[in-house]
């Protein structure tokens, strides 16, 4: 049973948040939610990559105890600028320091929002420290799902999904399932299928003959969501939905027959759960990431997110389409990669990061992204993934192979 709005949060001390990826889209939305609830939450530590100016701005506004940047030179610049501004925030640098912040004894919640494989080790550090982890980093489950879920179970860390689709599924599940993320018995709880929705991106009606000519500017212009460049391209190829499919399989302990992917262009229904009695429970709302962020921060209570309420009278209609794998080969590849094993999903994810970067830099065509991903998965030797070092080894090898494939495409 869910607590009344604000009940649990009001009864507790102010929650300290470590925001991994504070300068990114999810990080900025998290800070917006904190701004709406200053009496309940404190930005204890902010972590970024190399965006010094934005980190300075965030530190001045939210006054965290710690700030960390992955890039050491950027961290030095940050320290100098904060000192000049008279701020006492302690500045740290590098992956080791970031992992230590994720596991800091004074941290109550960790928002895991670093994009890509770079977020893997800090997120794992938070789990190993038994933190409440608000999971927005898809790659953690895509690259080492079994290892990660096993660690969650072993450490009794609380895992709450932030991705709008997975959060919608989470909210549509019975309380017993919410308490068993990663190992809930769906059938025993009367659940028939997890229904994952996706907008289909900006090119769902574009003629396939035009796909070779799609530009980075067109690909990052998502029709519904405000997101970073990489995830916007992933949405356009539906690799984003493929990664979410893999993530959902791990989060909800779902078999292939318990998964359904459908295209819902309006992005109003964020995902659904089918029950064995014919009921379908869906979570709806305006497409704004502050809603799922606020839900995870307050769980099992509710807090103000700053999101405009859904106006049903403004809806022109809700439509649904079956995914077209010719239009979205990356989605098909992701489903097949999960069936092949953890090595394949790791290889695919690494290849995709390299391919998307190459596309954004105009080195390859939009349609080459899927070609690079498929070729890398084909070339990487099938192997057993037993530990994090195995994951990192496959990730590193796959990135090198992806770069070679890109060179061959340009030849």
From Swiss-Prot:
NADPH binds at residues 23-26, 49-51, 137, 139, 228. Its EC number is 1.1.1.267. 1-deoxy-D-xylulose 5-phosphate binds at residues 138, 164-165, 199, 222, 235, 240-241, 244. One of its GO terms (molecular function) is manganese ion binding. Pathway: Isoprenoid biosynthesis; isopentenyl diphosphate biosynthesis via DXP pathway; isopentenyl diphosphate from 1-deoxy-D-xylulose 5-phosphate: step 1/6. The keyword Manganese applies. Keywords: Isoprene biosynthesis, Manganese, Metal-binding, NADP, Oxidoreductase. Transmembrane segments: none annotated. GO terms for biological process: isopentenyl diphosphate biosynthetic process, methylerythritol 4-phosphate pathway involved in terpenoid biosynthetic process. Mn(2+) binds at residues 163, 165, 244. Its cofactor is Mg(2+); Mn(2+). It catalyses: 2-C-methyl-D-erythritol 4-phosphate + NADP(+) = 1-deoxy-D-xylulose 5-phosphate + NADPH + H(+). Belongs to the DXR family. Catalyzes the NADPH-dependent rearrangement and reduction of 1-deoxy-D-xylulose-5-phosphate (DXP) to 2-C-methyl-D-erythritol 4-phosphate (MEP). This is 1-deoxy-D-xylulose 5-phosphate reductoisomerase. It comes from Mannheimia succiniciproducens (strain KCTC 0769BP / MBEL55E).
């Amino acid at each position: 049973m869910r607590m009344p709005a604000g009940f649990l949060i009001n009864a507790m001390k102010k929650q300290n948040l470590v925001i991994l990826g504070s300068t990114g889209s999810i990080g900025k939305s998290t800070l917006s939610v904190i701004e709406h609830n200053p009496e309940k939450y404190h930005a204890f530590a902010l972590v970024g990559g190399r965006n010094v100016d934005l980190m300075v701005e965030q530190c001045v506004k939210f006054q965290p105890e710690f700030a960390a940047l992955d890039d050491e030179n950027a961290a030095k610049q940050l320290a100098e600028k904060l000192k000049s501004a008279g701020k006492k925030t302690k500045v740290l640098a590098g992956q080791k320091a970031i992992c230590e912040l994720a596991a800091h004894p004074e941290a109550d919640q960790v928002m895991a929002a670093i994009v890509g494989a770079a977020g893997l080790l800090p997120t794992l550090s938070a789990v190993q420290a038994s933190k409440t982890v608000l999971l927005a980093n898809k790659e953690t489950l895509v690259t080492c799902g079994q290892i990660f879920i096993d660690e969650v179970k072993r450490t009794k860390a609380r895992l709450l999904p932030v991705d709008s689709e997975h959060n919608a599924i989470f909210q549509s599940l019975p309380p017993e399932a919410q308490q068993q993320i990663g190992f809930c018995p769906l059938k025993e709880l009367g659940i028939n299928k997890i229904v994952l929705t996706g907008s289909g991106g900006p090119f769902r009606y574009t003629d396939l003959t035009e796909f070779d000519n799609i530009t980075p500017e067109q690909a990052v212009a998502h029709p519904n969501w405000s997101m970073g460049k990489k995830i916007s391209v992933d949405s356009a190829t539906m690799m984003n939905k493929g990664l979410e499919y893999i993530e959902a399989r791990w989060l909800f302990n779902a078999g292939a027959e318990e998964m359904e992917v459908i295209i819902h262009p309006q992005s109003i229904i964020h995902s659904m759960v089918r029950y064995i009695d014919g009921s379908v429970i869906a979570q709806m709302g305006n497409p704004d990431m502050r809603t799922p962020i606020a839900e995870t921060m307050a769980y099992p209570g509710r807090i103000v997110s700053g999101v405009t309420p859904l106006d049903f009278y403004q809806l022109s209609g809700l439509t649904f389409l079956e995914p077209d794998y010719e239009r979205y080969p990356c989605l098909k590849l992701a489903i097949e990669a999960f069936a092949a094993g953890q090595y394949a999903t790791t290889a695919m994810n690494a290849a995709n990061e390299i391919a998307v970067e190459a596309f954004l830099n105009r080195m390859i065509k939009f349609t080459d992204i899927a070609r690079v991903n498929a070729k890398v998965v084909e070339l990487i030797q099938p192997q057993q993934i037993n530990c994090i070092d195995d994951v990192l080894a496959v990730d590193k090898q796959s990135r090198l192979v992806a770069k070679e494939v890109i060179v061959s495409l340009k030849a």
